[in-house]
């Protein structure tokens, strides 16, 4: 691993990756951690939110436009000034160029940088189907790199009920829950 960091990814756009990324960046900054942010792909809007939260520029890393060596060089640039990096994925975890190729996906970026993935799942309106969805994602590629899940738009009670199920049936750690807006 080049540097301590993680990729926040999701099954699809609209899952709350940007909100969760900004909340995580703010929490790390509040704990006086020297954190920096990246966005996978060419998106320029989300990096502006990252910068607003942490006060330092957020950079783009795109495995379609840049080769593996250049990606590692860009990620490693100025790393001694930071203790941790958070990379926000784009679209779904495996959605690269045109939504059909691995190149350009958050997964490909995590592979290239040898980083773990934390999956953000919008669990609103789901019960056990959420476990089936996660199981499918985990089985799709055995090198999924997923170490944990953040459930977005759900309740504390639901998470208390589902945490043992997720941990026992999937071997995943439930890292955080984000409540539904009222």
Describe each region flagged by the PLM:
Residues 176-182:
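Conserved small/polar residues in nucleotide/adenosyl-binding loops
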Residues 40, 154, 181:
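Hydrophobic pocket-lining residues within nucleotide cofactor-binding pockets
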Residues 2-15, 19, 25-113, 121-148, ...:
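ATP-dependent carboxylate-amine ligase catalytic core
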């Amino acid at each position: 691993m080049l540097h301590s960091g993680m990729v926040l990814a999701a099954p699809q756009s609209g899952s709350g990756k940007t909100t969760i990324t900004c909340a995580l960046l703010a929490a790390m900054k509040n704990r006086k951690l020297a954190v920096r942010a990246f966005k996978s792909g060419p998106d320029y809007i989300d990096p502006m939110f990252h910068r607003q939260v942490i006060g330092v520029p957020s950079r783009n890393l795109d495995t379609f436009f840049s080769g593996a060596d250049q990606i590692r060089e860009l990620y490693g640039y100025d790393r001694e000034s930071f203790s941790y990096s958070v990379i926000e994925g784009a679209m779904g975890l495996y959605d690269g160029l045109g939504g059909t190729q691995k190149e350009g996906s958050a997964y490909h970026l995590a592979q290239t940088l040898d980083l773990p993935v934390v999956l953000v799942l919008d669990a609103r309106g789901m019960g056990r189907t959420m476990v089936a969805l996660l199981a499918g994602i985990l089985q799709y590629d055995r090198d999924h790199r997923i170490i944990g899940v953040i459930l977005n738009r759900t309740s504390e009670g639901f998470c208390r009920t589902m945490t043992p199920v997720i941990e026992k049936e999937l071997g995943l750690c439930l890292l955080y829950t984000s409540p539904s807006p009222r």
